[in-house]
Amino acid sequence: MLWFKNLLIYRLNREIPLVAQEMESQLSAMAFTPCGSQDMSRTGWVPPLGGGSDALTHCANGQILLCARKEEKILPAPVLKQALQAKIERLEGEQHRKLKKTEKDALKDEVLHSLLPRAFSRFNQTWLWIDSVNNLIMLDAASAKRAEDVLALLRKSLGSLPVVPLTLDKPIEMTLTEWVRSGNTPAGFCLQDEAELKAILEEGGVIRCKQQALVCDEIAVHIEAGKLVTKLALDWHERIQLVLADDGAIKRLKFSETLRDQNEDIDREDAALRFDADFALMTGELAVLIDELITALGGETAQ
């Protein structure tokens, strides 16, 4: 199983039935199919277990895992430009006149479609985890754009998906700044050696610290000058390390070897059983982490 590296968290703002068995037929209508000869991109659902199963959902203890795959055709701009220029020059030579802009635009589309069947494809996969117990949806996505694209696919598949980004009662950067300023963190959380500080005013600059003790005079001076901590590396119970950003995004998740080794007694040859155990272990840990982190940051904004 691919352990999550990032977490973008969304709140279901009203209850809707999210049951794996019922979702199967809804998701199958949007199952992934490869790009046709004239498609620039395609996105759809694939089995989380890969070739080991045809099921588009994987469920354990009220947690549902989905996987979206996207195929994009890669057409380097210089290749398109060169082919277009060659066609323009040939036509202008044959017709003994300069082509109009509208004609060149039409030619560009024509050249694009002629090149598409020969273009290489780039694939990416995005994992989506539905915590039906706590009414949360988490995505292993490094950008909000990718997360929103996958949520849009899920919304289209289900017909409705009332979700909003998780919002907290207090600005995250204010809380992170206080943790670094005082050196005091809530129980279970420890400061690591990496942070980013930004000035409130845009022209005030950005400070990025790596492999540096954060509770020190140097950092204190920046905070006193008005900079706020916008990214902070944390350790949680010596089980998970992460970088928390001021928009609530959790990046660079790293699970301890002690945690990951808890399922080593399960035979790796039984891929489905190991996948199920790792998924249950990962989501169980992350659900507690998310709950404790929300509390540590001052709680959610009332819906």
From Swiss-Prot:
Q: Which GO terms describe its biological process?
A: DNA recombination; regulation of DNA recombination
Q: Which GO terms describe its molecular function?
A: double-stranded DNA binding
**Which keywords does UniProt give here?**
Cytoplasm, DNA recombination
Annotated coiled-coil segments of the chain: none
User: Is Cytoplasm included in the keywords of this UniProt record?
Assistant: yes
Q: Which domain of life is it from?
A: Bacteria
Q: Does the keyword Cytoplasm apply?
A: yes
Record-linked InterPro entries? RdgC
Any single Pfam family the record assigns to this protein: RdgC
- Cross-referenced HAMAP family, in alphabetical order? RdgC
Q: What is this protein called?
A: Recombination-associated protein RdgC
Q: What is the lineage of its organism?
A: Bacteria, Pseudomonadati, Pseudomonadota, Gammaproteobacteria, Enterobacterales
Q: What is this protein's gene name? A: rdgC
